[in-house]
Curated annotation (Swiss-Prot):
This is Uncharacterized protein MG296 homolog. Pfam families: Mg296. It comes from the Bacteria. It comes from Mycoplasma pneumoniae (strain ATCC 29342 / M129 / Subtype 1).
């Protein structure tokens, strides 16, 4: 795995492990509710085909918190294209986690836009905020 992508994954995972999970879960589900009004969902879309990070976190807290760590690892492997450059891999990882990162910022009590911008500067990704 590319070092910069690994550093980004570890940063997000460490930030996730530092926050109170129940508060994070509530914030994530609220962010997801707001975002779902802008998502295009087609009749033939299968719920199982959606990314883990675009589904509400509703079940057992222990299961979900351990699943988040597994899904972060899986996502990093999926976007780690050997032919792609480091920047595009990190950008894909960031874009898949935009809602997740926003929920982290809210849970930490940090301005969402500023948090995204700092992440962009630190890891060289183009942020949406």
């Amino acid at each position: 795995m590319k070092p910069q992508l690994l550093a980004l994954k570890q940063f997000v995972q460490t930030e996730f492990e530092k926050v109170d999970f129940e508060t994070f879960r509530q914030n994530f589900n609220r962010c997801l509710e707001r975002e779902q009004s802008t998502l295009l969902i087609y009749e033939d879309d299968d719920y199982d085909d959606q990314s883990f990070f675009l589904k509400p976190m509703l079940s057992d807290a222990f299961f979900i918190s351990s699943e988040v760590v597994k899904q972060l690892d899986l996502l990093a492997v999926l976007v780690d294209n050997p032919k792609g450059d480091v920047k595009s891999c990190c950008q894909s990882f960031y874009e898949a986690l935009t809602l997740f990162i926003s929920a982290l910022a809210i849970t930490k009590g940090v301005d969402v836009g500023r948090y995204h911008q700092q992440l962009g500067k630190r890891f060289g990704v183009l942020t949406v905020y």
